[in-house]
């Protein structure tokens, strides 16, 4: 294979890897970042992105913030869990019983530090509240 062909293949792969990362960041935003402090857990958790293996997700934490502020946690971080240096307003929805959809949830609000998994300077996984595992 000639050098130009290898360069082309490498460029395509690099472009696809960036697309994959942006999808993970986009999914993180959909699942965890919300701008309004008033959340109805029973309504929001009935969305299909919170259904795992046909079952309602047991727990999900929402970060009440802008995506820009949350993304800043990962500035300069390539691949590791990072604890925020500032506290965030959080709303955690917890399933209260195993029933068919729509599942019932309780809501808990708090202000605390968050731990996120960073990949190539983007948050891709909510890892914890108050400390990193």
Curated annotation (Swiss-Prot):
The modification Pyrrolidone carboxylic acid is found at residue 23. InterPro entries: RNaseA, RNaseA-like_dom_sf, RNaseA_AS, RNaseA_domain. GO terms for molecular function: carbohydrate binding; endonuclease activity; nucleic acid binding; RNA nuclease activity. The keyword Cytoplasm does not apply. It holds the Pfam family RnaseA. Substrate binds at residues 57-61. One of its GO terms (biological process) is defense response to Gram-positive bacterium. Keywords: Disulfide bond, Endonuclease, Hydrolase, Lectin, Nuclease, Pyrrolidone carboxylic acid, Secreted, Signal. The active site is at 32 (proton acceptor), 125 (proton donor). Its main location: secreted. Residues 1-22 form the signal peptide. Transmembrane segments: none annotated. It is found in: Secreted. It comes from the Eukaryota. GO terms for cellular component: extracellular region. It is an enzyme of class 3 (hydrolase). Its EC number is 3.1.27.-. Disulfide bonds join 41-93, 56-103, 74-118, 115-132. Belongs to the pancreatic ribonuclease family. PANTHER family: RIBONUCLEASE, RNASE 3. Preferentially cleaves single-stranded RNA at pyrimidine residues with a 3'flanking guanine. Hydrolyzes poly(U) and poly(C) as substrates, and prefers the former. The S-lectins in frog eggs may be involved in the fertilization and development of the frog embryo. This lectin agglutinates various animal cells, including normal lymphocytes, erythrocytes, and fibroblasts of animal and human origin. It is cytotoxic against several tumor cells. Monomer. This is Oocytes ribonuclease. It comes from Aquarana catesbeiana.
């Amino acid at each position: 294979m000639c050098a130009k062909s290898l360069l082309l293949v490498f460029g395509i792969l690099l472009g696809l890897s960036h697309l994959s990362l942006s999808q993970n960041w986009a999914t993180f935003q959909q699942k965890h970042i919300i701008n309004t402090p008033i959340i109805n857990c029973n309504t929001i958790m009935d969305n299909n992105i919170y259904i795992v293996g046909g079952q309602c997700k047991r727990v999900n934490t929402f970060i009440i913030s802008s995506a820009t502020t949350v993304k800043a946690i990962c500035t300069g971080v390539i691949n590791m869990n990072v604890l925020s240096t500032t506290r965030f307003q959080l709303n955690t929805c917890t399933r209260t019983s195993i029933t068919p959809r729509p599942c019932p949830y309780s809501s808990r609000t708090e202000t605390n530090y968050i731990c996120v998994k960073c990949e190539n300077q983007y948050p891709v996984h909510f890892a914890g509240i108050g400390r990193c595992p």
